[in-house]
């Protein structure tokens, strides 16, 4: 009977432990925190968006970095398989907008409790408050791990330590150190699925404002479009956040952000011509009202002053005094509300980490290192990341499962 040690009790680690156990191994799951699945508890705003209910090819379209590497793992353990696993083990699920899958209870704890119960049933020995300090190798083969309490021998080690995002959950980049010490390449670590800071103070009055059904685009200094999306976003004290902004960060983290502009189309369903006609009708109806007052039928109160300042039209003007030139300026800003990008928020605020152990060093069919026999990597520690919507947790489940199966 092989002995398998898994470092890290998150999504990847728990599925690796499950997979290794059902394949007849003696399995030890080592977690440096006081409980398993600490990051799972806070995903999906505490509801745990655990996968996305789409086919493998559509899933891969949402993977930003190294999607081809994941093809085999996702076919081994697909979103359907993950949903079946939880349903069959008593955790009822539901699918919401954007094919996002959540526990029916809306409690992330139900996901972790289900996994822990299954691991216990399969005989996995869970060792909490156990930090690994080194992976021991000899002649390019794993021999065991060194912990603060001593040496643990084993036949295989699976590194599921997560990335460098949300360090309070225990993701402090340990896996990158293990990888480098065993000769692996680690690509540059960057924040992904993170808020974006804006220059200046032209957004300060918008803090807390949520916008739905808007279109955003990011453009380089030469005007070339870098990213475009449609959906929901939020203004914050530092700039912008929300689903479409987080997704944009997955692309922007690979871009020089100097002179990058964010444009928000507040009325994406209307052309500028149709929007001008709408403005004309609104202003004719409210002839004696001030422009600021009349704009309330078009925009949230917090946005009106910002739009008028950027369009250069006096909000105190009566609607009957608004010229066609004024209307066109307002229509343009409504379609092109522009801000200057400063930088991404720091990695400790990121939902996931971009970069990690180079997939060139890993066998995609097994998740085993090509350099060290018996050493496997799974989950966020790898140089793979995806958009928001349950994709990253599914990647952790799938790569963990494959690693455990082959350990």
Where are each of the predicted segments found?
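Glycine-rich loop(s) and the adjacent beta-strand/alpha-helix scaffold that form part
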Residues: 156-202
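Glycine-rich FAD pyrophosphate-binding loop
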Residues: 21-45
């Amino acid at each position: 009977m092989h002995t398998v040690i898994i470092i890290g009790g998150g999504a990847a680690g728990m599925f690796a432990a499950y997979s290794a156990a059902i394949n007849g191994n003696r399995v030890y799951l080592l977690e440096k925190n006081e409980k398993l699945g600490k990051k799972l508890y806070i995903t999906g705003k505490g509801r745990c968006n655990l996968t996305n209910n789409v086919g493998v090819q559509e899933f891969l379209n949402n993977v930003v970095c190294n999607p081809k590497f994941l093809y085999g793992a996702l076919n081994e353990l697909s979103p359907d398989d993950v949903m079946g696993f939880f349903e069959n083990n008593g955790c009822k699920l539901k699918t919401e907008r954007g094919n996002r899958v959540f526990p029916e209870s809306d409690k992330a704890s139900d996901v972790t409790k289900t996994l822990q119960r299954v691991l216990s049933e399969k005989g996995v020995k869970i060792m909490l408050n156990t930090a690994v300090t080194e992976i021991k190798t000899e002649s390019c083969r794993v021999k065991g791990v060194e912990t603060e309490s001593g040496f643990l021998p084993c036949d295989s080690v699976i590194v599921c330590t997560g990335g460098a995002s949300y360090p309070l959950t225990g993701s402090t980049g340990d896996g990158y150190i293990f990888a480098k010490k065993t000769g692996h390449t680690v690509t540059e670590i960057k924040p992904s699925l993170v808020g974006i800071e804006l220059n200046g103070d032209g957004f300060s009055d918008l803090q807390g404002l949520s916008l739905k059904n808007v279109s955003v685009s990011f453009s380089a200094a030469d005007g070339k479009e870098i990213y475009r999306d449609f959906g929901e976003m939020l203004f914050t004290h530092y700039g912008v956040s929300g689903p479409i902004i987080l997704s944009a960060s997955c692309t922007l983290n690979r871009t020089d952000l100097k002179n990058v502009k964010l444009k928000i189309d507040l009325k994406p369903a209307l052309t500028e011509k149709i929007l001008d006609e709408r403005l004309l009708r609104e202003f004719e109806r409210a002839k004696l009202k001030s422009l600021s007052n009349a704009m309330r039928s078009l925009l949230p109160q917090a946005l009106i002053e910002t739009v008028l300042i950027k369009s250069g039209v006096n909000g105190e003007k009566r609607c009957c005094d608004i010229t066609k030139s004024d209307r066109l300026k307002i229509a343009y800003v409504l379609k092109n509300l522009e801000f200057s990008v400063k930088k991404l928020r720091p990695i400790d605020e990121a939902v996931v980490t971009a970069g990690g152990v180079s997939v060139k060093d890993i066998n995609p069919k097994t998740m085993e290192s090509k350099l060290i026999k018996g050493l496997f990597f799974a989950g966020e520690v790898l140089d793979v990341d995806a958009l928001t919507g349950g994709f990253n947790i599914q990647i952790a489940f799938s790569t963990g499962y494959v690693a455990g199966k082959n350990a």
